[in-house]
């Protein structure tokens, strides 16, 4: 891997790996090698959830469990992680197999999000929980400062449904139009038809549910509710 690109990535992350092989593994998609990042992703997912839950618990002492769960879901969902990945310019650092490279895998939100979680897992193994917690809180500082409890933290499908029901309009319909990839690494494309929009909106994700949520979020943006 290009040392200049890797050094730039570590500067953007705010962390330099002591064991560079952990960084390489975190950046390796399963399409590229048998030593890929999925186990690190599993670890990082749990660490991220803990760090964000702990931060919300102490920031919002009077907020109930439901609102805290919704805020956490907003902060750890795939498109938020993909936003972080783009801020880190992570796409050009990924190690992908030929098929994923050809299909633009370095832009896929699910791959970008999974890689951020793998990096978290890698940093934890390379250091300790205190270091990775400090790093995550630094990445999330602005988002944690801006987030607040309330209806906006409901997931996009729920908000879209409530908006339409409140206006006595038909509920949205979701249609799977494409499924790409092998069983262990699929990408779903969903068309969502919404009353008031002339064309269906499109969402993609690593599961049908995630793709539907992404489509609903696009619909909310087109309805200028996001």
From Swiss-Prot:
Transmembrane segments: none annotated. Keywords: ATP-binding, Cytoplasm, Endonuclease, Hydrolase, Magnesium, Metal-binding, mRNA processing, Nuclease, Nucleotide-binding, RNA-binding, rRNA processing, rRNA-binding, tRNA processing. PROSITE patterns: DS_RBD, RNASE_3_1, RNASE_3_2. One of its GO terms (biological process) is regulation of gene expression. Changing residue 117 to D: Nearly complete loss of RNase activity, still binds RNA. Partially rescued by Mn(2+). It is found in: Cytoplasm. InterPro entries: dsRBD_dom, RNase_III, RNase_III_dom, RNase_III_sf. Residues 6-128 form the RNase III domain. Its main location: cytoplasm. Mg(2+) binds at residues 41, 114, 117. Induction: Expression increases as the growth rate increases. Encoded in the rnc-era-recO operon. Processes the 5' end of its own transcript leading to mRNA instability. Divalent metal cations, preferably Mg(2+). While only 1 Mg(2+) is detected by crystallography, other evidence indicates there may be more than 1 metal necessary for catalysis. Binding of the second metal my be promoted by substrate binding. Residues 155-225 form the DRBM domain. Non-competitively inhibited by 2-hydroxy-4H-isoquinoline-1,3-dione. Activity is down-regulated during cold shock by direct interaction with YmdB. Also down-regulated during entry into stationary phase by an YmdB-independent mechanism. GO terms for molecular function: ATP binding; double-stranded RNA binding; enzyme binding; magnesium ion binding; protein homodimerization activity; ribonuclease III activity; rRNA binding. Disruption phenotype: Slower than wild-type growth. Transient accumulation of the 30S rRNA precursor occurs; 90% of 16S rRNA is correctly processed while an extended version of 23S rRNA accumulates in the ribosome. Half-life of a number of RNase III processed transcripts increases. In the absence of era and rnc there is a defect in chromosome partitioning. In strain HT115, loss of immunity against a plasmid with homology to CRISPR spacer sequences. NCBIfam families: RNaseIII (TIGR02191). This is Ribonuclease 3. It comes from Escherichia coli (strain K12). The gene is rnc.
